[in-house]
Design a protein with these regions (language model features):
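N-terminal cap/lid segment of alpha/beta-hydrolase-fold proteins
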Residues: 1-32, 163
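Short beta-strand/loop motif that positions the catalytic acidic residue
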Residues: 192, 198-200, 204
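C-terminal catalytic histidine-bearing segment of alpha/beta-hydrolase fold enzymes
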Residues: 12, 213-267
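Short beta-strand element of the alpha/beta-hydrolase
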Residues: 33-42
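Catalytic nucleophile-loop/oxyanion-hole region of alpha/beta-hydrolase
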Residues: 48-50, 68-105, 247-251
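Short amphipathic alpha-helix adjacent to the substrate-entry channel of hydrolases
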Residues: 50-68
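Primarily recognizes the serine-hydrolase "nucleophile elbow" in alpha/beta-hydrolase
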Residues: 92-163, 180
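Acidic catalytic loop of the alpha/beta-hydrolase fold
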Residues: 157, 203-207
Length: 267
């Protein structure tokens, strides 16, 4: 496996992609061009969680993907829509460098955890917004993922919100009702939203499961393909459900197998 770091911002060195690339071997020719997964760690927009970064990359490398961890602006370094523009820039980077990175530019999925799930969902619902193309010179749809995986995502700024995520994302605009609705993603779903895989635990006390339910309901209303898994027990931030990360839970950890199957069948 090869790793390499690519910096995407001239003003913020913390905005970067860490690439995890499978080696190329004569007897494994498919490694020369793998599907890709772009990973958005959580952390309430205050930091990027290491538990939702490299371990996720290693997991998906083992399942046949080349993986890319995306560190975006956090902790007040920027406010919305900067993170969405950065995510679009990350997608552009992968497609611009698909040959070098040994990935299929038509098979790039995103995965986000908690607040990283919010960013992934913003990209998956708002990739077509004009302000993104005003900021980045690229063809229409160049930043559009093939599909998105949302793991215990922050979605709503309403009654069931994770308030801290929105406070940090919006900064001085945190009480602006128009902005709050704009980033409350159950309202952002349109016919242009990408196919979605979601998982959450019913017992999550940090980001209530209603976040995922509201998003799934919005997807249903627009007839967007999706798969939703709600596990009865467990807590926020279970990632891969492995003991070395937090706690072993084979049942919930099966989400990885389910997501892999979903990706293989998503066009």
């Amino acid at each position: 496996m090869e790793t390499e770091v690519f910096h995407l911002s001239e003003t913020n060195p913390d905005v970067r992609i860490t690439a995890y690339l499978a080696g190329t071997y004569e007897r494994i020719p498919h490694n020369e061009k793998r599907p890709a997964i772009l990973i958005f760690p959580g952390g309430g927009y205050a930091y990027c969680s290491s538990r939702e970064a490299e371990p996720i990359a290693h997991e998906f490398i083992a399942h046949g993907y080349n993986a890319f961890v995306f560190d975006y602006s956090v902790n007040g370094a920027a406010v919305y829509p900067t993170q969405l523009i950065e995510a679009s820039l990350a997608m552009k980077f992968l497609r611009d460098n698909a040959e070098k990175l040994r990935i299929d530019p038509e098979r790039i999925f995103t995965i986000g955890f908690s607040a990283g799930g919010h960013l992934a969902a913003m990209l998956g619902t708002m990739w077509h917004k004009n302000f993104i193309y005003d900021a980045i010179d690229m063809p229409y749809g160049y930043n559009k993922p093939t599909g998105m995986i949302l793991c215990y995502p922050v979605i709503t700024s309403g009654k069931y919100t994770h308030r801290g995520s929105f406070d940090t994302l919006l900064g001085d605009g945190k009480n602006d009702k128009k902005l709050l609705r704009e980033v409350s993603l159950e309202y952002a779903v349109t016919k242009k939203t990408v196919p979605t895989f979601i998982w959450h635990t019913r017992a999550d006390k940090t980001v209530p499961v209603i976040n995922s339910i509201l998003f799934a309901e919005a997807l249903s209303k627009k007839n967007i393909p999706y798969e939703l898994h709600i596990y009865p027990d467990g807590w926020h931030g279970m990632t891969l459900c492995r003991e070395f990360l937090d706690a072993e839970n084979e049942y919930i950890g099966d989400w990885v197998r389910c997501a892999e199957h979903w990706m293989k069948n998503t066009k």
